[in-house]
């Protein structure tokens, strides 16, 4: 009995049925097979999807290639079918007039040779220069203003076809050659018909005086077209300029003031379609390169860029290469070399510096009060002293230099233009770009720091096809510039005085980017010599 209870109450191991393990193994196997089947299906679908996508891309690529080939064939056919009476470009629809195309090539060659016109066209468009206003179709609101002039100037004739066509253009020509209308007419003409808002045309110039002059010329074009032109420059309060620029379509600005307005968030240049850099070489000389780069960076990347310059040095070439797209270069005369206007009679007198003011008074009385005379001093302090001397001598003189306010300078310039005063005294602030009509005589009281500035100074006379006189008082202090001056005189067919020849050839000073033209070039790798003081 006891043994039976022990058996009943003891631990007994209970084994699971065999068929339960088999069921579990079967389910696991089915689950695995199901998973593999699903993965296989997904892999197949993924492969089919990829093949379908590749097939679609292949077909699209094929269609695109066929479409391109068809388009090229069509264009080739159109070129073959086009008549020789016109030369056109599809970029903005400029079509060379049939009358211009009909002119004999000899007449075109004569114009190019007589005016020393050179066109470097990377697009090979082959546009002929516009010899008459009848050869160009301008908007009706602009044409009456332009046709008041007898005919286009050489820079206008050669550049207009490319500018109207929408190409980037570099114009290299002497000051007073009609450059403002060369870029102004195509720019205004091209924006009249569209309804785009905001600033459309931006012209950057190196000085306030030049900016105001360009503003006056462009206003002649914009006032009849329902467009507003404003001038932005330093020396006056910003408030009025900020207010005016909000409704403007055309802006003429000096780099410094424009950068100020950009930094203030007062002007938006993203809508600019036409960017003009006028007197580009002068702006680089004045150290505006970084400002120019900042300004250009704020404009529309699809803009048309125009650059006008009196000279074509390496720095200007590099600037053009950076910001312009396959620019057409139009040159009037040999602008790679420094050359003076051949219509100007140049006289150089070598003298004692102490005799200059006496000689100036003699020249002013000699040339009389019936013609406009422009006298150049080198520094503003000199200009102030000479102005006082001329007033004491009974001359009604107007003056523009750095010591005067912008209002005083503008008033003086206007007085000279109107003829209230026939004598203007200026420093080099007025030496470039200013279009002062009917200046007959330029007198260099003090020779400038460079022969380049000399050429720009005397370029104030002999403008727009007229003749002029340049009288220069030269001293021994400037003898290091005698050789370069003699080259300019000879190049323009002018006599070289014996006194100037006595200074001999010109040994060009070495120039350093940081230290200027008068530094001493030494080898910094050599050990310095010891100097003992007794």
UniProtKB/Swiss-Prot annotation:
SUPFAM superfamilies: P-loop containing nucleoside triphosphate hydrolases
EC number, as in UniProt: 3.6.4.13
Helicase ATP-binding domain location: 160-330
Residue stretches of biased makeup (Basic residues): 31-53
Broad EC category: hydrolase
Cellular location(s): Nucleus, Nucleolus
Substrates-to-products reaction catalysed: ATP + H2O = ADP + phosphate + H(+)
Main location: nucleus
Stretches for region Disordered: 1-96
Family of this protein: Belongs to the DEAD box helicase family. DDX5/DBP2 subfamily.
Protein name stated in the entry: ATP-dependent RNA helicase DBP3
Gene it is expressed from: DBP3
């Amino acid at each position: 009995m006891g043994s039976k209870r022990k058996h009943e109450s003891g631990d007994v191991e209970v084994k699971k049925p065999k068929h339960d393990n088999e069921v579990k193994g079967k389910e696991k196997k089915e689950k695995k097979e199901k998973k593999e089947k699903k993965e296989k299906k997904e892999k197949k679908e993924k492969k089919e999807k990829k093949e379908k996508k590749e097939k679609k891309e292949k077909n699209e690529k094929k269609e695109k290639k066929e479409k391109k080939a068809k388009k090229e064939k069509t264009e080739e056919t159109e070129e073959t079918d086009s008549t020789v009476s016109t030369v056109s470009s599809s970029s903005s629809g400029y079509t060379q007039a049939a009358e211009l195309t009909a002119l004999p090539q000899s007449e075109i060659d004569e114009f190019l040779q007589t005016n020393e016109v050179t066109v470097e066209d990377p697009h090979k468009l082959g546009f002929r220069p516009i010899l008459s206003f009848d050869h160009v179709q301008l908007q009706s609101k602009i044409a009456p203003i332009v046709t008041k002039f007898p005919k286009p100037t050489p820079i206008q004739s050669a550049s207009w076809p490319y500018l109207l066509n929408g190409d980037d253009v570099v114009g290299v020509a002497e000051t007073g050659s009609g450059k403002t209308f060369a870029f102004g007419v195509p720019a205004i003409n091209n924006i009249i018909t569209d309804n785009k808002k905001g600033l459309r045309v931006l012209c950057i110039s190196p000085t306030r005086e030049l900016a105001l002059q360009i503003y006056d010329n462009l206003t002649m074009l914009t006032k009849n077209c329902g467009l507003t032109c404003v001038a932005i420059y330093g020396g006056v309060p910003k408030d009025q300029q900020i207010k005016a620029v909000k409704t403007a379509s055309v802006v003429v600005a000096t780099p410094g003031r424009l950068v100020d307005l950009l930094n203030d968030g007062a002007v938006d240049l993203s809508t600019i379609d036409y960017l003009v850099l006028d007197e580009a070489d002068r702006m680089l000389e004045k150290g505006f390169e970084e400002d120019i780069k900042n300004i250009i960076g704020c404009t529309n990347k699809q803009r048309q860029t125009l650059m006008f310059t009196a000279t074509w040095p390496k720095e200007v070439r590099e600037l053009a290469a950076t910001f312009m797209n396959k620019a057409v270069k139009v040159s009037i005369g040999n602008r790679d070399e420094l050359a003076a206007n051949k219509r100007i009679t140049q006289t150089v007198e070598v003298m004692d510096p102490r005799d200059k003011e006496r000689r100036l008074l003699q020249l002013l009385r000699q040339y009389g009060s019936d013609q406009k005379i422009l006298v150049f001093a080198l520094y503003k302090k000199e200009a102030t002293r000479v102005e006082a001397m001329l007033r004491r001598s009974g001359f009604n003189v107007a003056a523009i230099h750095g010591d005067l306010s912008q209002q005083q300078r503008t008033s003086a310039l206007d007085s000279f233009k109107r003829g209230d005063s026939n004598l203007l005294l200026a420093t080099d602030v007025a030496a470039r770009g200013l279009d002062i009509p009917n200046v007959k005589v330029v007198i260099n009281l003090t020779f400038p720091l460079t022969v380049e500035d000399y050429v720009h100074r005397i370029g104030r006379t002999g403008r727009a096809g007229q003749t002029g006189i340049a009288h220069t008082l030269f001293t021994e202090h400037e003898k290091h510039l005698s050789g370069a001056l003699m080259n300019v005189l000879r190049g323009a067919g002018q006599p070289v005085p014996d006194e100037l020849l006595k200074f001999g050839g010109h040994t060009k000073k070495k120039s350093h980017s940081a230290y200027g033209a008068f530094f001493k070039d030494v080898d910094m790798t050599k050990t310095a010599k010891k100097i003992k003081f007794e």
